[in-house]
Amino acid sequence: MWDKVIEINLNAQFVLSRELGKDMLENGSGKIIFTASLLTFQGGITVPGYAASKGAMKSLIMALSNEWAGRGLNINGIAPGYIATDNTEALRNDPQRSRSLLARIPQGRWGTPDDFKGPVVFLASRASDYMNGSIITVDGGWMGR
């Protein structure tokens, strides 16, 4: 399981960014937005491979931004909190676990994919031209607690 998680969550994003980055570097501009996680900043419980892959994502974002910012690329990330998707269905369907998670989220609700529209558009736009190596959390306030 460890290898599969690292392959999907870290290696695939690195390989894709390397390939896309080649063209962007030739053109002298581009924006890469990585998918991080709350576990980019926290250790998590029972998910060491996932936590390690997302912790490494933070370092990858910073390393690539250090290399490519001066060449016209912006490298940033989005860190989703607890979002109502297929991946979180079991958590949402467990009343006790869901209550404990929602109690920690200041907005008191699960996020939705629509919650990413603004942050992703911002990072993809010229409004973020001076941002590099940053990760925006979209978590209903989870990390503020």
Name every feature range the model reports, one short phrase each.
Residues 105-116, 127:
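A conserved structural motif in NAD(P)-dependent oxidoreductases
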Residues 1-6, 101:
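Substrate-binding pocket helix/loop in short-chain dehydrogenase/reductase
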